[in-house]
């Protein structure tokens, strides 16, 4: 047998080790973090609790600054983990106190989403996105015009809360400036179910942001099977984008209604309340558009639907209505209803004993009002040039540093 001789030069060539995958700890809720510490790091589970507090209470992302962790544990974390938060491309305050952040998603600089903070008397609400874009094609929504790109990760969802809470100086259980979170930003939350539910778990965890379940609201256009699943996995407040009380009109506004018509949607909402004893009502959102869905007959149809819902749940005020004046955006064919029509619509509902509120328009001077959220997706938005200039400017500053 011939002997195979390996040239010595080949023996000297270093073999590059496979890159170690690092776990972004923002992707994990308490249970996931406990498993990571026990199974991957071989550490006690309580260490996960310490790290959660550092990340979500003190907004620390550098393991070396987590001073109650031993040197050996910090070395393990550097090797196996990281804390990656969204990059703030720019932030805009509104004249009414509303604040909007444009956050870059991913490392390629092609995707971004918007997050909005809305202060009010005694409360501060953060509107959080769940997807880059949206694929449901609701005809009156700005986000729908850009199409759907992808789901956000858990880290990208909870990262929005992290960015806002850090900016606000929020201290859970002490100096709470962020009191409510609404999953009403870009995207349909129930189409990104697992990541959204995991992120909401961190929002409600005392080691996270410590929000009561009733102060976290998920808004859906009406994916009936996922509403049923949500009832078994979470007890957050539920809001439904209704916008019409008859199927013909709703199908023209919310195409999803063709698959899940109003009767099926209302039945699933009733099941949600029956299976969730901590929740006693569902909020039905109704965007008022001039000459489209703001006539007295539309109000009477909505009043009848709410009474039927109360009867199905066997509870008064099980259905609450939130009237939203339409917020115009470039290219839309819809107009906002006049103040007279809005008040007349509300009066019909109130006279029918339907608990009804009119949402005050906030942040429309910075395109942060409801329905105006529209982050960059590839090359399809009017702010793409500004987005790219900002990123290029940041890169130049980093290179010069």
Curated annotation (Swiss-Prot):
<protein>
    <recommendedName>
        <fullName>Dual-specificity RNA methyltransferase RlmN</fullName>
        <ecNumber>2.1.1.192</ecNumber>
    </recommendedName>
</protein>
<dbReference type="GO" id="GO:0019843">
    <property type="term" value="F:rRNA binding"/>
</dbReference>
<dbReference type="InterPro" id="IPR048641">
    <property type="entry name" value="RlmN_N"/>
</dbReference>
<dbReference type="InterPro" id="IPR013785">
    <property type="entry name" value="Aldolase_TIM"/>
</dbReference>
<feature type="binding site">
    <location>
        <begin position="187"/>
        <end position="188"/>
    </location>
    <ligand>
        <name>S-adenosyl-L-methionine</name>
    </ligand>
</feature>
<keyword id="KW-0411">Iron-sulfur</keyword>
<feature type="binding site">
    <location>
        <position position="219"/>
    </location>
    <ligand>
        <name>S-adenosyl-L-methionine</name>
    </ligand>
</feature>
<comment type="similarity">
    <text>Belongs to the radical SAM superfamily. RlmN family.</text>
</comment>
<keyword id="KW-0808">Transferase</keyword>
<keyword id="KW-0949">S-adenosyl-L-methionine</keyword>
<feature type="binding site">
    <location>
        <position position="134"/>
    </location>
    <ligand>
        <name>[4Fe-4S] cluster</name>
    </ligand>
</feature>
<feature type="binding site">
    <location>
        <begin position="241"/>
        <end position="243"/>
    </location>
    <ligand>
        <name>S-adenosyl-L-methionine</name>
    </ligand>
</feature>
<keyword id="KW-1015">Disulfide bond</keyword>
<keyword id="KW-0819">tRNA processing</keyword>
<feature type="binding site">
    <location>
        <position position="141"/>
    </location>
    <ligand>
        <name>[4Fe-4S] cluster</name>
    </ligand>
</feature>
<dbReference type="GO" id="GO:0002935">
    <property type="term" value="F:tRNA (adenine(37)-C2)-methyltransferase activity"/>
</dbReference>
<dbReference type="GO" id="GO:0000049">
    <property type="term" value="F:tRNA binding"/>
</dbReference>
<dbReference type="GO" id="GO:0005737">
    <property type="term" value="C:cytoplasm"/>
</dbReference>
<dbReference type="GO" id="GO:0030488">
    <property type="term" value="P:tRNA methylation"/>
</dbReference>
<dbReference type="InterPro" id="IPR004383">
    <property type="entry name" value="rRNA_lsu_MTrfase_RlmN/Cfr"/>
</dbReference>
<dbReference type="GO" id="GO:0070475">
    <property type="term" value="P:rRNA base methylation"/>
</dbReference>
<feature type="disulfide bond" description="(transient)">
    <location>
        <begin position="127"/>
        <end position="370"/>
    </location>
</feature>
<keyword id="KW-0479">Metal-binding</keyword>
<feature type="binding site">
    <location>
        <position position="327"/>
    </location>
    <ligand>
        <name>S-adenosyl-L-methionine</name>
    </ligand>
</feature>
<dbReference type="InterPro" id="IPR027492">
    <property type="entry name" value="RNA_MTrfase_RlmN"/>
</dbReference>
<feature type="active site" description="Proton acceptor">
    <location>
        <position position="114"/>
    </location>
</feature>
<comment type="function">
    <text>Specifically methylates position 2 of adenine 2503 in 23S rRNA and position 2 of adenine 37 in tRNAs. m2A2503 modification seems to play a crucial role in the proofreading step occurring at the peptidyl transferase center and thus would serve to optimize ribosomal fidelity.</text>
</comment>
<dbReference type="GO" id="GO:0070040">
    <property type="term" value="F:rRNA (adenine(2503)-C2-)-methyltransferase activity"/>
</dbReference>
<feature type="binding site">
    <location>
        <position position="138"/>
    </location>
    <ligand>
        <name>[4Fe-4S] cluster</name>
    </ligand>
</feature>
<dbReference type="GO" id="GO:0051539">
    <property type="term" value="F:4 iron, 4 sulfur cluster binding"/>
</dbReference>
<keyword id="KW-0963">Cytoplasm</keyword>
<feature type="active site" description="S-methylcysteine intermediate">
    <location>
        <position position="370"/>
    </location>
</feature>
<keyword id="KW-0698">rRNA processing</keyword>
<keyword id="KW-0004">4Fe-4S</keyword>
<dbReference type="Pfam" id="PF04055">
    <property type="entry name" value="Radical_SAM"/>
</dbReference>
<dbReference type="GO" id="GO:0046872">
    <property type="term" value="F:metal ion binding"/>
</dbReference>
<dbReference type="InterPro" id="IPR040072">
    <property type="entry name" value="Methyltransferase_A"/>
</dbReference>
<feature type="domain" description="Radical SAM core">
    <location>
        <begin position="120"/>
        <end position="365"/>
    </location>
</feature>
<dbReference type="InterPro" id="IPR007197">
    <property type="entry name" value="rSAM"/>
</dbReference>
<keyword id="KW-0489">Methyltransferase</keyword>
<dbReference type="Pfam" id="PF21016">
    <property type="entry name" value="RlmN_N"/>
</dbReference>
<keyword id="KW-0408">Iron</keyword>
């Amino acid at each position: 047998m011939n002997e195979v001789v390996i040239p010595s030069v080949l023996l000297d060539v270093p073999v590059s080790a496979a890159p170690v995958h690092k776990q972004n700890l923002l992707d994990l809720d308490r249970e996931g973090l406990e498993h990571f510490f026990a199974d991957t790091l071989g550490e006690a589970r309580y260490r996960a609790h310490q790290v959660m507090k550092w990340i979500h209470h003190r907004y620390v992302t550098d393991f070396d600054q987590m001073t109650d962790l031993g040197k050996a544990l910090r070395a393990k974390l550097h090797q196996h983990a990281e804390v990656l938060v969204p990059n703030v491309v720019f932030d805009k305050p509104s004249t009414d106190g509303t604040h909007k952040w444009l956050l870059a998603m991913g490392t390629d600089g092609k995707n971004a989403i918007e997050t909005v903070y809305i202060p009010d008397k005694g409360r501060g609400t953060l509107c959080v996105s769940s997807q880059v874009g949206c694929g449901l094609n609701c005809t009156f929504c700005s986000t729908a015009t850009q199409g759907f790109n992808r789901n956000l990760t858990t880290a990208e969802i909870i990262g929005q809360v992290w960015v806002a809470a850090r900016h606000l100086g929020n201290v859970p259980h002490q100096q709470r400036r962020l009191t409510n979170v609404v999953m009403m930003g870009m995207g349909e939350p129930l189409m990104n179910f697992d990541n959204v539910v995991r992120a909401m778990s961190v929002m409600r965890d005392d080691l996270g942001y410590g929000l009561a379940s009733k102060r976290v609201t998920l808004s859906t256009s009406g994916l009936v099977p996922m509403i049923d699943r949500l009832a078994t996995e979470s007890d957050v407040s539920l809001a439904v984008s209704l916008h019409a009380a008859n199927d013909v009109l709703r199908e023209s506004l919310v195409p999803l209604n063709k698959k899940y018509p109003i009767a099926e949607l209302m039945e699933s909402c009733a099941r949600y309340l029956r299976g969730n004893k901590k929740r006693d009502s569902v909020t039905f959102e109704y965007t008022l558009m001039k000459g489209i869905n703001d006539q007295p007959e539309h109000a009477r149809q909505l009043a009848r639907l709410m009474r039927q819902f109360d009867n199905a749940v066997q509870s008064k005020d099980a259905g609450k209505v939130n009237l939203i004046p339409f917020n115009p955006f470039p290219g839309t064919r819809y107009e906002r209803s006049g103040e007279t029509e809005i008040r007349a619509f509300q009066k019909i509902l109130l006279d029918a004993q339907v608990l009804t509120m009119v949402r005050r328009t906030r942040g429309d001077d910075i395109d942060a009002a409801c329905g105006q959220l529209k982050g960059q997706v590839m090359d399809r938005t009017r702010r793409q040039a500004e987005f790219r200039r900002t990123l290029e400017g940041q890169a130049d500053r980093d290179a010069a540093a």
